[in-house]
Regions:
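C-terminal output helix
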Residues: 129-139
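Two-component/phosphorelay signaling modules centered on CheY-like receiver
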Residues: 26-53
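Conserved acidic carboxylate
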Residues: 23
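Receiver (REC) domain active-site loop signature in two-component systems and cognate sites
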Residues: 79
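Acidic, metal-coordinating helix/loop segments flanking the phosphotransfer/catalytic sites
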Residues: 46-72
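Active-site residues of response regulator receiver
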Residues: 76
Length: 145
């Protein structure tokens, strides 16, 4: 698997929601892909595209974020090259990205959650995450009713 991947969850053109998932574990990437495809099919019903991009680390994520706009970032906190904490700091320091919703996702303990919250994440999910929690968080932050 390469550093960056892209797919449109409902097969339509990329003119709707754009979500960036930053994760280095291929199995977890598959789970997010499945959940977001379900969200596109069940909640958006093909009316609004949900374009999902994947990056394996914070550096690849920043490249994508500076190349084009996104509506939501969901990031693991522990990854090689540039971890999620560093990514959150970079996002919050960029004027154009400062208000971008960021969800931190980690199996780390309370210290990881506290650190992520202090850095300015919008939301935090603890691994292992439940499908419903991912879907509810994405719906809430993208304001999907």
């Amino acid at each position: 698997m390469g550093q960056e991947q892209s797919q449109t969850a409902n097969g339509t053109s990329p003119s709707g929601y754009r979500v960036l998932i930053v994760e280095d574990n291929p199995h977890i990437i598959e789970m997010y892909s499945y959940v977001l495809k379900k969200l596109a099919a069940n909640e958006l019903k093909g009316t609004t595209p949900l374009e999902v991009h994947f990056a394996a680390d914070g550096h690849a994520a920043m490249t994508l974020l500076t190349d084009s706009p996104f509506h939501l970032v969901m990031t693991d906190l522990y990854m090689p090259v540039m971890d999620g904490f560093q990514l959150i700091e970079k996002i919050r320091s960029e004027p154009a990205l400062k208000s971008l919703p960021v969800v931190a996702i980690s199996a780390g303990g309370q210290d990881a959650k506290d650190r992520a919250m202090k850095l300015g994440v919008t939301s935090y999910l603890k691994k292992p995450v439940r499908f419903a929690d991912v879907m509810d968080t994405v719906k809430q932050l993208l304001r999907i009713t």
